[in-house]
């Protein structure tokens, strides 16, 4: 019986979606603009990387051709060699968003139909009733922030005051999110998590997709830095996902990275949450090597987004892509005849773009495995085609959305 490995390269978009102008993102292109910047010498950083973007293994899977399908051009350095080793195409999101839950849920067969709630870019950003309820239920002396902000910038600005006052830093963004940053030692990690659990309940009437705990350490003198103990408190998908179908069929499921958080820990099987892309990929490959027939490993690699996309860090993003590319041979090595690996993304986060937010983009779809077909699968009109294709490959009943490319 076949097995499947689904890898989401968080924010690795390949060109503005057809409706990107509605989001102020027309012309955005995460992979394409990184490749162009590197070709022009703007992706160099001493001690990290230099020169053109080098992704030979992803190019051999059809990434450059997927980019061409999305934008009409192959990014510099991504022209494929022969023979190509995968099915390649690009997918368009049907959900009205450019956030992590919307992208992942649609990949898993459940497009978000009702719009998420968002907070205005004002100060204060949160309704007074919401803030009052959180303060009362969590026993807080108050909150700091209460506005749209970059997570690293607001910690730098308010970290010292937070440590002095005990008030957590609450902020949001263009996504449907309520984020709480607090010092792991001065405030306490468990208290931060409990505050987020309370915030999750307080935010439910506002249709907020995620409450995120953003722990940090450091001091006013030495500076503050985020830690790896972030935790997301998401609402559950409204309908049955690919994961639910796998669970109902009694299949082995392993969720690596923040997958468990994204799906509210429903039907996520064994959860593994290491820190960093390299450790997450290690864990996924180890789990897949031991996976029984019919099993499924679902992996999110978040560092592209959090460490480089939001920070508009072209050299860092390029280096992260190259590091992943170098490990593609390890992925091939764990695949047995009949196994399937799909590499895709959930949205864009163009590090050359204005601001610090996600970008509304199309995503690559690269599907491969020993003995599987190769060639173009064209434009997929919903991310749900990915989940539908994985379900078909694993012999599951059809999902509620999406059309398999098999």
Swiss-Prot record:
InterPro entries: Alkaline_phosphatase_core_sf, DeoB, Metalloenzyme, Phosphopentomutase_DeoB_cap_sf. Mn(2+) 2 binds at residues 305, 310, 358. Signal peptide: none annotated. Pathway: Carbohydrate degradation; 2-deoxy-D-ribose 1-phosphate degradation; D-glyceraldehyde 3-phosphate and acetaldehyde from 2-deoxy-alpha-D-ribose 1-phosphate: step 1/2. Keywords: Cytoplasm, Isomerase, Manganese, Metal-binding. Its EC number is 5.4.2.7. It catalyses: 2-deoxy-alpha-D-ribose 1-phosphate = 2-deoxy-D-ribose 5-phosphate; alpha-D-ribose 1-phosphate = D-ribose 5-phosphate. Binds 2 manganese ions. The keyword GTP-binding does not apply. The keyword Cytoplasm applies. Gene3D superfamilies: Alkaline Phosphatase, subunit A, Phosphopentomutase. GO terms for biological process: 2-deoxyribose 1-phosphate catabolic process; 5-phosphoribose 1-diphosphate biosynthetic process; metabolic compound salvage; nucleotide metabolic process. Isomerase that catalyzes the conversion of deoxy-ribose 1-phosphate (dRib-1-P) and ribose 1-phosphate (Rib-1-P) to deoxy-ribose 5-phosphate (dRib-5-P) and ribose 5-phosphate (Rib-5-P), respectively. HAMAP family: Phosphopentomut. This is Phosphopentomutase. It comes from Methylorubrum populi (strain ATCC BAA-705 / NCIMB 13946 / BJ001).
């Amino acid at each position: 019986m076949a097995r499947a490995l689904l890898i989401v390269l968080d924010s690795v978009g390949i060109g503005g979606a057809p409706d990107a102008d509605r989001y102020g993102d027309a012309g955005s292109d995460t992979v394409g603009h990184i490749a162009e910047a590197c070709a022009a010498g703007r992706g160099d950083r001493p001690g990290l990387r230099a020169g053109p973007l080098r992704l030979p293994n992803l190019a051999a899977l059809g990434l450059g051709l997927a980019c061409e399908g999305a934008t009409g051009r192959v990014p510099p350095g991504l022209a494929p060699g022969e023979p190509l080793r995968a099915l390649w195409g690009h997918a368009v999101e049907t959900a009205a968003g450019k956030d992590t839950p919307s992208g992942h849920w649609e990949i898993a067969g459940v497009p978000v139909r009702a719009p998420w709630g968002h907070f205005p870019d004002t100060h204060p950003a949160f309704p007074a009733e919401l803030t009052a309820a959180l303060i009362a239920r969590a026993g807080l002396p108050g909150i700091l922030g209460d506005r749209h902000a970059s997570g690293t910038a607001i910690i730098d600005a308010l970290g010292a005051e937070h440590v002095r006052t005990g008030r957590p830093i609450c902020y949001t963004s263009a996504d449907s999110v309520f984020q709480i940053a607090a010092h792991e030692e001065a405030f306490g990690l468990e208290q931060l998590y409990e505050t987020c659990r309370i915030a999750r309940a307080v935010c439910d009437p506002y249709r907020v997709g995620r409450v995120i705990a953003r722990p940090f350490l450091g001091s006013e003198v030495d500076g503050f830095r985020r830690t790896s103990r972030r935790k997301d408190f998401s609402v559950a998908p409204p309908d049955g996902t690919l994961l639910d179908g796998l669970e109902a069929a009694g299949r082995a499921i392993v969720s690596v990275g923040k997958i468990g958080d994204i799906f509210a820990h429903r039907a996520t099987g064994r959860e593994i949450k290491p820190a960093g892309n390299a450790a997450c990929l290690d864990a996924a490959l180890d789990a897949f090597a031991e996976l029984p027939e019919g099993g499924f490993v679902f992996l999110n690699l978040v560092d592209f987004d959090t460490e480089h996309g939001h920070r508009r860090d072209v050299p860092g993003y390029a280096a992260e892509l190259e590091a992943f590319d170098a490990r593609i041979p390890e992925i091939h090595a764990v695949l047995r005849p009949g196994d399937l690996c799909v590499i895709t993304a959930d949205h864009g986060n163009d590090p050359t773009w204005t601001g610090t937010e996600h970008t509304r983009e199309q995503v690559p779809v690269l599907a491969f495995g020993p003995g599987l077909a190769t060639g173009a699968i064209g434009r997929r009109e919903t991310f749900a085609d990915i989940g539908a294709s994985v379900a078909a490959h694993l012999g599951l009943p059809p999902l509620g959305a999406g059309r398999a490319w098999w």
